């Protein structure tokens, strides 16, 4: 903003009748209150119907005031204004205000010229009515001015005469000495006061230095205590280390038992699968024994005639229908798929047995196979037909009862082994 623009702005403000005097150096620093006052005055002049309250206490109020005033002036004067520059209230805001003031000055000048033509006669009438009062006031002003001038002349003349008398007269030694003594006393009093101030300052300085030393000593003492606290080992730290050691031991024990539990669960599932397979095989063998016994019984009842192997009934003229085959009369039921049962919970506190106790024996299986093979009528020679059916059923029941007793009394033992045949340690199993 140039000096010429500032001067022109101040002149325009006086021209539109702004009540507050504005200097050229007013806008060297931001003054938001002055800018708000100028905008409020301009809005009252241009748009008196749009009464805007000058509330600029907070930042939100200032922003609202600037935006509303700028919108009113833009719609009224048809100007393009920058609200950010006006809100800054600096030298850049003077250019925006200068645009507004120029339009307002032209507006006021046009309104004044239009009103002067219609009110010239009324103004002359008003002056004639107050002519006597104006004459009295002018006479009073003239009298007061003459009195003031005469008093000033008398005062100046008296002062000049006094100065001439003082310069021409001889000074009195007593009065001079008295004045000098008085001046000396005044200076001595001033020196005493200064000396007292110096002593008080020294005393205060000593007190401050003493306080500073005390603070330094307290700081050093606290630092020593802090170093001692840092150097000493607190008692709870040893307890914490002991608890950490116990926790590590418990964690190792938990990990070992967890690995053992997983291994035993796997062994239990494998044992359940083997047991189910044994039960299925045993049921198959019993079913085969029953079928063979039934077949033998039927063959004995019908005289050993087999519809598929023998064709003598075709040549027999007395046989009307062929005899049904034994296997067609009794078909075996289909075996259902095996579904392993859910593993039972394991006691984790139980000790894991040694490797020596895990040994699998095949003697009982061999005995069972021998019993089944000995009881199978297909592999042995046919019994004589004189045996009764009651004896055959009794032998079949004894075989089934014996096989069930063997299954109940079986004790299974397994060895820990990997796929390659190597023994496994339950504590060193990796999952």
Swiss-Prot record:
UniProt KW Cytoplasm keyword: yes
Region: Disordered, residue numbers: 346-431
Biased composition (Basic and acidic residues): 384-405
Coiled-coil ranges (or none): 177-218
Keywords for the protein's UniProt record, in alphabetical order: Cell projection, Cilium, Cilium biogenesis/degradation, Coiled coil, Cytoplasm, Cytoskeleton, Flagellum
Cellular component per GO, a single term: axoneme
A biological process from GO: intraciliary anterograde transport
Bias type Acidic residues, positions: 352-370, 420-431
Subcellular localization, as worded in the UniProt entry: Cell projection, Cilium, Flagellum; Cytoplasm, Cytoskeleton, Flagellum axoneme; Cytoplasm, Cytoskeleton, Flagellum basal body
One matching Pfam family: Cluap1
Family that this chain belongs to: Belongs to the CLUAP1 family.
Function, in words: Component of the intraflagellar transport complex B (IFT-B) involved in flagellar assembly.
Protein's name in the database: Intraflagellar transport protein 38
């Amino acid at each position: 903003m140039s000096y010429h623009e500032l001067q022109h702005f101040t002149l325009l403000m006086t021209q539109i009748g702004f009540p507050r005097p504005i200097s050229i150096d007013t806008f060297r620093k931001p003054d938001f209150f002055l800018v708000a006052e100028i905008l409020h005055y301009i809005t009252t002049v241009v748009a008196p119907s749009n009464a805007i309250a000058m509330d600029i206490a907070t930042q939100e109020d200032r922003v609202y005031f600037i935006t509303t005033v700028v919108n009113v002036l833009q719609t009224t004067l048809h100007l393009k204004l920058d609200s950010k520059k006006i809100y800054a209230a600096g030298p850049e805001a003077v250019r925006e205000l200068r645009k507004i003031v120029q339009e307002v000055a032209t507006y006021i000048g046009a309104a004044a010229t239009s009103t002067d033509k219609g009110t010239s006669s009324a103004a002359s009438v008003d002056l004639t009515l107050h002519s006597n009062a104006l004459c009295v006031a002018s006479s009073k002003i003239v009298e007061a001015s003459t009195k003031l001038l005469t008093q000033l002349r008398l005062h100046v003349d008296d002062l000049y005469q006094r100065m001439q008398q003082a310069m021409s007269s001889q000074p009195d030694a007593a009065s001079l000495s008295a004045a000098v003594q008085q001046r000396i006393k005044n200076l001595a009093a001033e020196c005493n006061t200064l000396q007292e101030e110096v002593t008080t300052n020294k005393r205060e300085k000593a007190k401050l230095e003493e306080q500073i030393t005390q603070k330094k000593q307290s700081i050093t003492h606290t630092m020593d205590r802090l170093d001692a606290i840092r150097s000493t080992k607190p008692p709870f730290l040893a307890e914490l280390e002991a608890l950490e050691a116990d926790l590590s031991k418990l964690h190792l024990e938990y990990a070992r038992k967890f690995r053992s539990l997983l291994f035993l669960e796997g062994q239990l599932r494998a044992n359940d699968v083997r047991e189910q397979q044994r039960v299925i095989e045993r049921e198959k063998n019993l079913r085969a024994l029953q079928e063979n016994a039934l077949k033998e019984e039927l063959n004995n009842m019908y005289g050993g005639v087999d519809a598929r192997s023998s064709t003598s009934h075709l040549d027999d003229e007395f046989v009307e229908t062929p005899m049904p085959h034994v296997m067609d009369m009794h078909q075996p039921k289909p075996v259902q798929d095996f579904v392993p049962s859910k593993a039972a919970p394991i006691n984790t506190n139980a000790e894991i047995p040694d490797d020596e106790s895990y040994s699998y024996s095949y003697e009982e299986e061999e005995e069972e196979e021998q019993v089944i093979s000995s009881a199978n009528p297909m592999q042995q020679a046919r019994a004589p037909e004189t045996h009764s059916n009651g004896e055959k059923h009794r032998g079949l029941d004894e075989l089934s009862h014996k096989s069930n007793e063997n299954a109940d009394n079986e004790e299974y033992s397994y060895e820990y082994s990997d796929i390659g045949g190597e023994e496994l340690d339950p504590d060193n199993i990796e999952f």
